[in-house]
């Protein structure tokens, strides 16, 4: 319980550091854009990362208690392949069509809507990291090794502050999106945890095929969504929704083998 509480404390420190860095930019609306951008990114992250990881925890705990480490590794690998293959194209498609939806949903002026849009896009770069981190943390909790997520969040905190401060020092005119991008520290933390986990299980967790398919789907889906939203005449909101829908559909054949793994989780 102690390491878990300290880990949660570390996560809260990151939130505090985020708002402090935003105050250093002197940018009007920086804190607000970070809050809205994070909230938007959390919608797919909660529906995918949190939901899958929460459902998997009892299974992982059972495998760990029975020393079924091969099944434990395969369950993690399947979950990662699903999350990686889904979240990379989802992030690209959302980034392509998000701007008119932000303006319609929140009613801010053009400048504030643009700031929220770019901050959201920066957060969407970290969507995969947030999602796979849900699996990483629960993998160690299932093994009753909560100390490793604690070590990892310390590394994440240091990286976030370092990247964020370096970013606003060099690119202060960009402001909040740079701070949102600093959450890439979470992806680094997740990779760190999975490398650590692989070494403790003596078998590597292999997900490169899902990464490749996700990247290809992201390019095709994102470009499709953007072109449809930009060039089809009509309401900006409707064309953005149409572009995102069709962009998502064209991704499906590319990542279909990973999607089918949902039935095996």
Question: Regions from the language model: what does each represent?
Answer:
Residues 147, 157-194, 223, 227-245:
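Membrane-interface helix-loop junctions in multi-pass transport and translocation proteins
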Residues 9-43, 59-63, 99-111, 233:
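Helix-terminus/linker motif at the lipid-water interface of multi-pass membrane proteins
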Residues 209-262:
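Transmembrane alpha-helical segments of multi-pass transport proteins
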Residues 49-67, 137:
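Helix-loop junctions and terminal segments of transmembrane helices
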Residues 95-127:
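Interfacial segments at transmembrane-helix termini and the short loops linking adjacent helices
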Residues 136-144, 193-210:
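Alpha-helical transmembrane segments
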């Amino acid at each position: 319980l102690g390491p878990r509480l300290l880990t949660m404390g570390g996560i809260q420190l990151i939130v505090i550091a985020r708002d402090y860095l935003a105050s250093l930019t002197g940018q009007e609306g920086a804190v607000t854009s970070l809050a809205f951008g994070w909230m938007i990114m959390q919608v797919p992250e909660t529906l995918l990362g949190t939901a899958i990881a929460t459902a998997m925890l009892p299974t992982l705990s059972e495998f760990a208690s029975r020393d079924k480490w091969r099944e434990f590794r395969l369950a993690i690998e399947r979950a990662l392949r699903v999350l990686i293959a889904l979240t990379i194209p989802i992030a690209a498609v959302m980034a392509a069509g998000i701007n008119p939806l932000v303006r319609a949903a929140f009613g801010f002026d053009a400048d504030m809507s643009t700031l929220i849009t770019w901050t959201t896009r920066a957060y969407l770069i970290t969507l995969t990291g947030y999602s796979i981190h849900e699996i990483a943390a629960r993998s160690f909790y299932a093994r009753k090794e909560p100390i490793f997520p604690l070590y990892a969040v310390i590394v994440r905190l240091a990286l976030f502050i370092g990247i964020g401060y370096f970013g606003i020092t060099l690119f202060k005119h960009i402001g909040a999106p740079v701070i949102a991008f600093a959450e890439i520290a979470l992806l680094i933390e997740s990779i760190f945890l999975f490398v650590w986990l692989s070494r403790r299980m003596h078998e590597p967790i292999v997900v490169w095929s899902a990464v490749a398919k996700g990247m290809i789907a992201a390019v095709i889906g994102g470009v499709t969504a953007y072109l449809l939203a930009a060039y089809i005449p009509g309401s900006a909101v409707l064309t953005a929704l149409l572009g995102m829908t069709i962009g998502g559909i064209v991704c499906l054949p590319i990542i279909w083998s990973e999607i089918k793994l949902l039935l095996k989780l």
